[in-house]
């Protein structure tokens, strides 16, 4: 039974999106996991905690015996059934625990006894995590071009369309502003970093990559923060700024934040609850910048938002949202971005409309 334990093997697992049957407890998995991993634990959180206490008080042999006692009979059979099904569904997958220790070896042995030979990650999640960290450090050393521009400039789409582009907001499941949340919950910080590393490895492996194309992001994207090694390189990068007409930006924002978000919420929750979730999403976004706007201006814009939602509910038209979106851009988002851009003006090497920037990026 071949085990994979070299640095190149670990990288190959991430590049290939190799299915990983992660047998750690759910609490460990939630703190950090690899992108292609599914959690089928040997022990649940309570069982793991009980074995941990036993280990501290009585030693490893007693802890092992306690684990076998807790995972026995019907519980063991249920978990065996889940592992067997996962192995058959993912014949080219691999087992993983925290450090490639007893848990993955126990599951591997039980599967072997049931007629299934399945490899495991020698070194476990810890080894894969270190590989992800090191890969990000190395790959971040390549030159970077940042795509900048005011809100609604189509920066994310431009990055997505580049073969050497990495969509940081897509990986973070957040669009980086007060209205940036999506219907998918954000990953833990470690899981986000692992996903980013895997994406960079895959992008680099599939071409002769000379430079990265990334969106000009701040350190935080929602609750996730960029790895320091990448953030540091981004502060040194050149910037291409998209300068589209205001009307074009409004069309994009209408599509992305009103039409698409309303569709996504109703698709996920049904018409009635979806509408409520959509309304709360917009109000929450505006409320998040209440202090920046000042109470009086916030109340004015919130009233316009309510009126726009009433119009949208009764007529289906999203045009009413311009009454609060336009001043929000003119008074808050655009001045804020221009101020940030002024501080790094010496790094700006190209200005142009969306298509011009997209064409320029191809020449780099």
Curated annotation (Swiss-Prot):
GO terms for molecular function: transferase activity, transferring alkyl or aryl (other than methyl) groups; tRNA 2-selenouridine synthase activity. Residues 14-137 form the Rhodanese domain. Gene3D superfamilies: Rhodanese-like domain. It holds the Pfam family Rhodanese. It comes from the Bacteria. Keywords: Selenium, Transferase. GO terms for biological process: tRNA wobble uridine modification. CDD domains: RHOD_YbbB (cd01520). The active site is at residue 97. It catalyses: 5-methylaminomethyl-2-thiouridine(34) in tRNA + selenophosphate + (2E)-geranyl diphosphate + H2O + H(+) = 5-methylaminomethyl-2-selenouridine(34) in tRNA + (2E)-thiogeraniol + phosphate + diphosphate; 5-methylaminomethyl-2-thiouridine(34) in tRNA + (2E)-geranyl diphosphate = 5-methylaminomethyl-S-(2E)-geranyl-thiouridine(34) in tRNA + diphosphate; 5-methylaminomethyl-S-(2E)-geranyl-thiouridine(34) in tRNA + selenophosphate + H(+) = 5-methylaminomethyl-2-(Se-phospho)selenouridine(34) in tRNA + (2E)-thiogeraniol; 5-methylaminomethyl-2-(Se-phospho)selenouridine(34) in tRNA + H2O = 5-methylaminomethyl-2-selenouridine(34) in tRNA + phosphate. Its EC number is 2.9.1.3. PROSITE patterns: RHODANESE_3. Belongs to the SelU family. Involved in the post-transcriptional modification of the uridine at the wobble position (U34) of tRNA(Lys), tRNA(Glu) and tRNA(Gln). Catalyzes the conversion of 2-thiouridine (S2U-RNA) to 2-selenouridine (Se2U-RNA). Acts in a two-step process involving geranylation of 2-thiouridine (S2U) to S-geranyl-2-thiouridine (geS2U) and subsequent selenation of the latter derivative to 2-selenouridine (Se2U) in the tRNA chain. Monomer. This is tRNA 2-selenouridine synthase. It comes from Escherichia coli O127:H6 (strain E2348/69 / EPEC). The gene is selU.
């Amino acid at each position: 039974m071949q085990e994979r334990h070299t640095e190149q093997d670990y990288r190959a697992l991430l590049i290939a999106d190799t299915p990983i049957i992660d047998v750690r407890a759910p609490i460990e998995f939630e703190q950090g996991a690899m992108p292609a991993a599914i959690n089928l634990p040997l022990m649940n959180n309570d069982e793991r905690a009980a074995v941990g206490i036993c280990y501290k008080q009585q030693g490893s042999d007693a802890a092992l015996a306690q684990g076998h006692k807790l995972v026995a009979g019907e519980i063991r059979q249920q978990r065996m059934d889940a592992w067997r099904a996962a192995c058959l569904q993912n014949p080219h997958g691999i087992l993983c625990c925290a450090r490639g220790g007893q848990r993955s070896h126990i599951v591997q042995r039980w599967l072997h006894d049931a007629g299934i030979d399945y490899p495991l990650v020698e070194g476990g999640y810890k080894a894969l995590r270190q590989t992800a960290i090191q890969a990000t450090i190395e790959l971040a050393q390549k030159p970077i071009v940042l795509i900048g521009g005011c809100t609604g400039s189509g920066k994310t789409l431009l990055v997505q369309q580049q073969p050497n582009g990495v969509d940081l907001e897509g990986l973070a499941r957040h669009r980086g502003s007060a209205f940036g949340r999506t219907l998918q919950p954000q990953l833990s910080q470690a899981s986000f970093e692992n996903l980013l590393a895997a994406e960079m490895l895959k992008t680099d492996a599939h071409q002769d990559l000379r430079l990265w194309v990334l969106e000009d992001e701040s350190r935080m994207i929602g609750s996730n923060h960029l790895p320091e090694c990448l953030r540091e390189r981004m502060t040194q990068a050149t910037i291409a700024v998209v300068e589209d007409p205001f009307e074009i930006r409004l069309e994009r924002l209408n599509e992305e934040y009103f039409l698409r978000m309303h569709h996504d919420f109703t698709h996920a929750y049904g018409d009635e609850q979806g509408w409520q979730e959509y309304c709360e999403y917009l109000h929450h976004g505006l409320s998040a910048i209440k202090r920046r706007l000042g109470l009086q201006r916030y109340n004015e814009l919130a009233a316009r938002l309510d009126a726009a939602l009433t119009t949208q509910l009764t007529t289906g038209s999203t045009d009413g949202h311009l009454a609060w979106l336009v001043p929000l851009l003119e008074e808050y988002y655009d001045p804020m971005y221009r101020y940030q851009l002024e501080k790094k003006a010496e790094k700006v090497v190209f200005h142009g409309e969306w298509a011009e920037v997209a064409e320029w990026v191809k020449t780099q």
